[in-house]
Structure formats: C-alpha cells, structure tokens
C-alpha cells in the first residue's frame, strides 16, 4: 500500500505520531516516479536535490504545534506556474531553458505551508490543448491506459496524481484544463471562482479566463489545498477581496434540501450516452440523500465554444507577443535583421497549435474584424454569464458531465482541431462566466476509462460545491479506484 493511498489528514497524523517522516513521503514520490515515469511522462523537471534537503530540514520539526495539515506533503506544479530557480518551460521550446527569478504567489503560499515541490509537470504548450499532445517535448499518457490521452492542458498534473507519483498537484484552467484531465484520469479537480486564487506568476494564456486550482485524489484533500492557496494578493489586481472561509466545515455529507439544476443542453446533442447515464445515476444518489433536481436551460451555451476560442485566442495573441527573442527565452540563430529576429524566433519557438491560436486571435483583433468577432464574442460572454445568474437565482448548484465522453486514444483527434476543441464544450461556459466548478469521478465508460461529474457553483461559493462533491464521494466508491499501472 502506497503512502499516497492515505489522505492528507491521515498522513499528517502519522507524521505527528512519528510513524513516518517527511523523507519517507519524498522518497515514496521519487520511487514511484522511477517506476512509472518512463511510461506516464507526467514530469518535465524534477527537483530531487532541493526536495530531499527540504525533507531533512522538516524532519527536525516533526511534532511541532505550528505544523499545518500540508506540512511535508509532496506536490507537483504545472510548468506554467513560475518557480524560483526551477526550470519553467510552459512545455514550449520557446522557454526550454528558462529559470525564473521569483515564485508565483501560490508557490510562495505552499512553501509557507511547508509543502515540498517534487517537480514541474507536463502540459500542452502554453496551456493550449485538450490532450497533452501539444507539449513541445513529449506527450503525457493516461495512467489508466497508456494508449489514451490524460486530457489537457493540465494532463501532467492529473496523470501524476492518478499514477501515485505525488499526493496532489496544481494545474491551471482556462477552458476546462483542470476539470477535463481530472475527469479523464479519475481524480478530483477544481477550477475556483475567477479571482479566488492569485494569478501572479502564472504565465498568461488568456488573462480574463485563467485560474490556478488543485488536483487531488479526494474532495477533502482538494479543500485543504484550495484553502492554502486562496485569498487576495496585492501582486494581482484581479484577485478578489472576498473572505475565503473554512471549506472543510461543510464536508458533512449532508445535502438534504439542496436544489440542483441540470441543464438540458448538458445532456443533449454531442454528449455521449455513457456520460449522460453516469450523471443521471449520480443524481439518483444525491436525490436519495435528500437533494432535489430539476431540468433547466442555459440557452446561450451553444455559442460558448466559438465565443471562447475568439476571446482566448485574442488574449493569447497579445500575451504571447512578449516572446520575441529579445528579453528572454529562445532566440533564433537565423537572423539578418530585427524583423528576422522576431519572425524566426517565434516560428521556431512556438508549436503549431500555439501559432494557430495566435493567428486566430490576431485576425479577431484586426481593425476590419474587431466589431464582428471580438466585440460580438464579449457580448455573447455577457449573455452566457447572465444565463448562469438566472439559474442560480433559484438553485444551489448546477450538475452535468465534465466531458462528453471518456478519454480518447492518443493520436485520435490531434489532426482535427475542431473535434479536439469540442472536448471542452461542457467546461468552457464555466470559465466564460467566472464561476467555480469541480470534477469528481462518477463512473467508467465501456473502454474502462473514468468519467467525471461536474458540479458548478455560484461566484465564490466553493464551499457548496465541495459539500455536494464530498457527499457524493462518500456515498460512492469511485474515488477509491486506482489505475493499475
């Protein structure tokens, strides 16, 4: 039995009782990585020397009264979250040897909580992708079946947790990039409310959509991690001055009287029968615990995919303009003048998907098309946000599938961008509205790959979605299933 089969609270107790050491936890992580990483390929960079040194330092503090629940816990960090002195590449050749000189706010907070960073996790390049096949280095595989993708863009973050390489991880979610891989890998992934967690130190893809969040084995562990990284940050003007509260207090298993909305659009065209049936089965579980549910409509969700790709690509074209070969990152050797420097550096440094989205965004922002595309997409985004607000006026949470289907095979969709983009059709509206959502395991498809249940909450009401997710988790055993890698 792996130490990582235990929850954070169980491991904390074992540490305080001196049944295990922090060094034991760190060595457990690196041993598992040595055993499976050649197949899973979840990590881009390991930090073994510093992690082992930190473990020895913390071992001397075991049993101290001020040790928090995350004391000594091994964590993996998505490679678009900067880490001081530890290579951060965004899985792009553009940043292949970039060593940041500061920590992201979330990393600072986790260091203050005495977690130990095991390494940096693979992803789709600059967080653009749904399968991890867009990594500029190598593709991560799904621990449940290595022939299948782990999802993206936080595929390495989800796969590392599912494979037992780390206890938990950080990912980022712009259009589903935490929830979709969490669903595909059978783990728990939360996208917080926009502004709940500081984005300082997150390499920007689409600044109005990006949000950092936790990926864990259980809902309780997820709540611990979000508790640690949440809160206003003077380094991020978009972080919200809203009380964080105690997420753990609501994990009682009680959902009696809870009002659940189920959008008909989330169970209709384009959603596979397996995903639909798993959600209906989950609703029966919650209904049996005293919750009620009704079908509702989110009428503008059908426009979400087009809206998202116009807005996110537009923001990406602006955000990625900083990678020009002048200040940091790769610089082309094939240069005769300044224009060559810009053009060749970006052509050689960026992968195909990143270039595709930069081109789309530049087009949408161009003077002749701004009103027809970018401005119109912003107007539709407001309508989508209003849809959620209208539903939440009468309901506590919204529930549906996280993804239309279970994970697909490696290479199956990589040459068809539109089919690939459609994998995020159920997660994208949440980012456009800025509300929080969690994915928890809720079954398996015919290919024995995991399915995820998406629970969506009101702005800054992560506590309620944790309450529902935890109640469902405790009433089922899906979270106890492990990939037999």
Swiss-Prot record:
Sequence similarity: Belongs to the amidase family. GatA subfamily.
Subunit description: Heterotrimer of A, B and C subunits.
Gene Ontology MF: a single term: ATP binding
One annotated GO biological process: translation
Signal peptide (UniProt feature, chain positions): none
Originating species: Bacillus cereus (strain B4264)
Disulfide bond annotation, renumbered to this chain: none
Residues annotated as catalytic: 78 (charge relay system), 153 (charge relay system), 177 (acyl-ester intermediate)
E.C. number: 6.3.5.7
Catalytically driven reaction(s): L-glutamyl-tRNA(Gln) + L-glutamine + ATP + H2O = L-glutaminyl-tRNA(Gln) + L-glutamate + ADP + phosphate + H(+)
Domain of life where this protein originates: Bacteria
EC category name: ligase
Name recorded for this polypeptide: Glutamyl-tRNA(Gln) amidotransferase subunit A
GO cellular component, as recorded: glutamyl-tRNA(Gln) amidotransferase complex
Task performed by this protein: Allows the formation of correctly charged Gln-tRNA(Gln) through the transamidation of misacylated Glu-tRNA(Gln) in organisms which lack glutaminyl-tRNA synthetase. The reaction takes place in the presence of glutamine and ATP through an activated gamma-phospho-Glu-tRNA(Gln).
Sorted UniProt keywords: ATP-binding, Ligase, Nucleotide-binding, Protein biosynthesis
